[in-house]
Design a protein with these regions (language model features):
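PRPP-associated nucleotide enzymes
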Residues: 1-146
Length: 146
């Protein structure tokens, strides 16, 4: 397991924000709850936008994998053209494949780009913007042990 610090996150988010701004110029930031919320907020600051929304995606309840990915609280994105979908990591990619498919089904006129800090080679989907590849389990600085 690897701990991913706040300082690393800020440095990586700045790199990604510059790349996203220069190559895509999104109108909207869409964070996937919960892992993508901290990053979505950082991107909203760096890209100077208040159009920062979230949706929920659940693939596990506790340690039990659900038969289907639950996706809910999807904001209305029909009036926009370019949206980044932000999460902390793509692991197996199953959840993100479902999220991206649902968004494209609902908003076919919108161009979606996936942004993560980490992804794994075994993932079913590769992010459009990413700074780190890993095979390790990542413990993010925003994951609190209560």
């Amino acid at each position: 397991m690897r701990f991913y610090s706040y300082e690393e996150c800020v440095a990586d988010a700045k790199i990604l924000a510059r790349q996203i701004r220069d190559e895509f110029a999104p109108e909207v930031i869409l964070g996937v709850s919960r892992g993508g919320l901290a990053l979505a907020q950082l991107f909203a600051e760096y890209l100077d936008t208040r159009l920062c929304f979230s949706l929920n995606s659940i693939h596990y309840k506790g340690d039990v994998k659900l038969d289907e990915v639950e996706i809910f609280n999807i904001p209305e994105l029909g009036g926009y053209k370019r949206v980044i979908v932000v999460d902390d990591m793509v692991d197996s990619g199953e959840s993100m494949v479902a999220v991206m498919a649902k968004l494209r089904e609902l908003f076919s006129q919108v161009e979606f780009k996936l942004v993560t800090i980490f992804y794994k080679d075994k993932s079913l989907i590769k992010p459009d913007f990413c700074v780190r590849k890993t095979d390790e389990w990542i413990h993010f600085c925003w994951e609190v042990e209560l």
